[in-house]
Design a protein with these regions (language model features):
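Noncatalytic regulatory segments and standalone regulatory/sensor domains
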Residues: 227-320
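Active-site nucleophile-adjacent alpha helix/oxyanion-hole segment immediately C-terminal to the catalytic cysteine
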Residues: 7-141, 185-197, 291-294, 303, ...
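Short, compositionally biased, intrinsically disordered N-terminal export/targeting signals
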Residues: 2-6
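Extended hydrophobic/Leu-rich segments
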Residues: 15-19, 23, 49, 154, ...
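Core alpha/beta structural scaffold of self-assembling particle/tube/pore-forming proteins
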Residues: 121-182
């Protein structure tokens, strides 16, 4: 039985600080150990792996990133693991670097031979080693299509890894609405990790934004509550941000109905874009722990709720 299997076999809950302490001890032992160079990853240095693990543990995943690859699904999976069990995250990396492969319960992790012989440019060596290991047919960061992760695959990874409460609430064809967004918030408040399935445009910096959303192409992990700033018709200003609730949704739906009626009557004054509600939401993505939803309207403007919903295709919730 591997060290990773032993870590997973315990049924007692592990406190994060204890897991972090164990992770740092594992890193220290590995750095002083006899393995100085991996025969499986000849171009990845032990120092880069050790430094990468330390950065991820001490910053709780801040630097765990996909670079220019399409490995957002694997990044979301391993970020979820890292933030609750950093000791398991570290043990996986050590096992893969030392032995070329490992298992996490029923999840087999081994990179393709081409991936093992590659020195990545657009992402850290430790991230390439780990993220490519869950995609056995993935050879290079530039291979965008092979790096794509569909909801069913991400769900299976979590189940195979031992997460016992995994629910898929996504849609590949049409975007989701307010009710699904409220469910995501409620699940987040209940302690679930929420992997949002979105059009990446809603998290892109303003200068890289495109137009309308036609399909989901990105996974991110929620790192904040979903908050809404309602527009006050009387004061002509937005109200303070509040966590999304059913009453807020009911108010928004009424507002949408009123706007649609005004549009039908060609009353331009009543369909002013300034009445659009705003959404505030941060998520882990692209190696950064907290990236906010931003609008395509202005680089300094909070994102319109309607803009976010246009690129929101649901979520997967997980809990160990």
């Amino acid at each position: 039985m591997s060290s990773t299997s032993l870590l997973l076999s315990s049924t007692k809950p592990v406190i994060y600080q204890t897991a972090k302490k164990n992770a740092l001890q594992l890193i220290s032992s590995f750095s002083k150990g006899s393995v100085n160079k991996s025969t499986h990853y000849p171009l990845l240095t032990k120092k880069s792996i050790v430094d990468g693990m330390k950065d991820s543990i001490n910053n709780r995943g801040r630097f765990l990133g996909q670079g220019k690859s399409s490995l957002c699904g694997p990044a979301s999976f391993f970020f979820t693991l890292l933030k609750i069990r950093p000791d398991i995250y570290v043990q996986l990396i050590i096992d893969i670097y030392s032995n070329g492969k490992t298992t996490l319960k029923d999840l087999k992790l081994e990179s393709s031979q081409s991936a093992k012989n590659l020195k990545p440019v657009s992402l850290r060596e430790v991230d390439w080693l780990l993220l490519s290991s869950i995609k056995p047919k993935y050879d290079h960061p530039d291979e965008q299509f092979d790096g794509i992760t569909l909801p069913g695959k991400l769900k299976k990874w979590f189940i195979d890894a031992g997460f016992t409460d995994v629910v898929d609430n996504t849609n590949l064809i049409s975007n989701k609405g307010l009710e699904t967004l409220l469910k995501a918030q409620n699940d987040y408040s209940s302690g679930y990790t929420i992997c949002l399935f979105v059009d990446a445009d809603i998290f892109y910096p303003f200068k890289y934004k495109s137009g309308s959303s036609f399909f989901p192409n990105h996974w991110v992990v929620m790192n904040s509550d979903v908050k809404i700033r309602k527009y006050n018709e009387k004061t002509k200003k937005h109200k303070p941000a509040s966590i999304i609730t059913q009453p807020i949704i009911s108010s928004i739906k009424k507002q949408i109905s009123d706007i649609e009626t005004a549009a039908f009557l060609d009353d331009e004054d009543d369909v002013s874009t300034e009445t659009y509600d705003r959404i505030l939401l941060d998520a882990f993505t692209w190696g950064k722990q907290s990236v906010p939803v931003t609008s395509k309207i202005s680089s300094t403007q909070e994102a319109r709720l309607s803009y976010f919903l246009n690129g929101f295709y649901g979520y997967i919730k997980v809990k160990r």
